[in-house]
């Protein structure tokens, strides 16, 4: 869990420093740039000869511009109007990632930073759980990987990945109609 959180913090920090865009972490593993998903992170744990290894996959949309069928998606370019040379971008990111991974923060600090960076934290949002929509407020993520949400009809509850969906794109669509 802490490697997931720390990786998300590293990616968020890199993109925020590079672009000056609003960069938030959408629990558990996406980066939101100016309201659009610009990055996804996947971490897989493997055991080989009694040693645990982690494979970290980070997909950053850098220059893509066509998201006509993906209303929640964006890229560094569409979120910031900044264009980067992909090789230079990749080299900068790689150096930043390695330096931060080698100097890992204490777990309590990671959890605090992660929670400060959560997308839609302490804001009324629309969630879908078991095909039912209701309002709720993201309170925090915990050390076990759960997201705590205060739901309008059910009170404070914890959720694991894929047990609930934040429908953040509906908010933008509603805002655009007003």
Stretches with model-predicted labels:
Residues 2-23, 33-178:
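Long, positively charged amphipathic alpha-helical accessory segments at protein N-termini or as interdomain linkers
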């Amino acid at each position: 869990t802490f490697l997931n959180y720390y990786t998300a913090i590293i990616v968020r920090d890199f993109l925020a420093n590079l672009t000056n865009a609003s960069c938030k972490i959408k629990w558990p593993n996406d980066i939101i740039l100016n309201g659009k998903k610009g990055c996804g992170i996947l971490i897989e744990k493997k055991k080989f000869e009694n040693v645990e290894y982690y494979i970290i996959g980070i997909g950053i949309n850098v220059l893509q511009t066509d998201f006509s069928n993906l209303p929640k998606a964006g890229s560094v370019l569409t979120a910031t109007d900044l264009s980067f040379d992909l090789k230079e971008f990749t080299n900068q990111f790689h150096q930043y990632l390695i330096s931060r991974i080698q100097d890992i923060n204490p777990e309590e600090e990671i959890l605090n930073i992660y929670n400060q960076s959560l997308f839609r934290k302490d804001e009324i949002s629309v969630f879908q759980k078991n095909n039912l929509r209701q309002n709720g407020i993201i309170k925090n993520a915990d050390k076990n990987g759960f997201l705590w949400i205060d739901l309008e009809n059910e009170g404070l509850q914890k959720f694991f990945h894929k047990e609930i969906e934040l429908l953040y794109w509906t908010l933008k669509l509603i805002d655009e109609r007003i």
